């Protein structure tokens, strides 16, 4: 089953220095029916104004994945670690109890646009504190997984995350690990098909809950970029 969640249905925020779209309850936006999906707690698209920053804060034990769509960001923690990430890169932070983290748009004249996901982290697992990956913009790519398969970022949870790039008319099929997945459109229009021949059309910024499907096929109606988050638990 595919249930779409359009960009217009998501929570919105505009603070001047920050513009945001929230898939699930976050900050001032609250919907008791949308507190996350399986181990996916947060899925935001945010635009930080030139020079803007998120002040240091602590997090619950989650893995934070930032997919940089445009601009350049710097991340720092209270332990003295820092890293920069630019458009075309994904950065994974394995947050730790008692450690605070900040984010800063390094540009003085260009906004920073990125997708941010929070995934519940298994408390028994200890992964590298910071991991970074270059995105392959020419094809589909596994960018995060439990064991770091195929050079992907290593998560502390049973989640597989795919970055998908297709040209118009191309298609890609994905075998899912369990009964749940979430599909997020980044750019342009495409449709998703299940083996039950159920079909859902998505445009820029739309998402879709996928339930009880063994596989899903994406067909690009125009050049497409999307994320598929495979969430068996």
Where are the predicted features?
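Conserved hydrophobic/aromatic beta-strand scaffold that supports enzyme active sites
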Residues: 45, 64, 90-92, 114-116, ...
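Short acidic-glycine-tyrosine-enriched beta hairpin
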Residues: 79-94, 135-138, 194-216
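Conserved, well-structured core segments that form or line functional sites
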Residues: 110-194, 200-204
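Glycine- and acidic-residue-biased ligand/ion/polar-headgroup-sensing regions
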Residues: 60-79, 87-90, 176-197, 204
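Contiguous mid-protein beta-loop-alpha structural module that forms a pocket-lining wall or clamp
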Residues: 63-119
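Conserved short histidine dyad/triad with adjacent acidic residue
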Residues: 4-14, 21-31, 39-59, 69-76, ...
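Ligand-binding loop in jelly-roll beta-barrel domains
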Residues: 95-125, 211-233
């Amino acid at each position: 089953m595919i249930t779409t969640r359009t960009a217009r249905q998501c929570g919105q925020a505009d603070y001047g220095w920050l513009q945001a779209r929230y898939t699930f309850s976050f900050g001032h936006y609250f919907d008791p029916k949308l507190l996350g999906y399986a181990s996916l707690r947060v899925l935001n698209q945010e635009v930080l104004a030139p020079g803007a920053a998120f002040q240091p804060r602590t997090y619950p034990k989650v893995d934070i994945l930032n997919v940089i769509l445009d601009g350049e960001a710097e991340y720092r923690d209270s332990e003295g670690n820092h890293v920069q990430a630019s458009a075309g890169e994904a950065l994974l932070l394995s947050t730790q109890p008692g450690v605070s983290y900040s984010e800063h748009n390094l540009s003085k004249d260009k906004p920073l646009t990125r997708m941010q996901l929070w995934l519940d982290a298994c408390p028994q697992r200890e992964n590298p504190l910071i991991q970074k990956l270059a995105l392959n913009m020419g094809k589909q790519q596994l960018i995060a997984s439990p064991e770091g398969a195929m050079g992907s970022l290593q998560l502390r949870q049973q989640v597989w995350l795919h970055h998908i790039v297709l040209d118009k008319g191309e298609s890609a099929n994905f075998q899912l690990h369990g009964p749940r997945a979430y599909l997020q459109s980044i750019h342009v229009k495409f449709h998703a098909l299940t083996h039950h021949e159920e079909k859902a059309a998505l445009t820029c910024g739309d998402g879709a809950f996928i339930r009880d499907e063994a596989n899903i096929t994406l067909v690009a109606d125009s050049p497409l970029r999307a994320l598929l988050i495979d969430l068996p638990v």
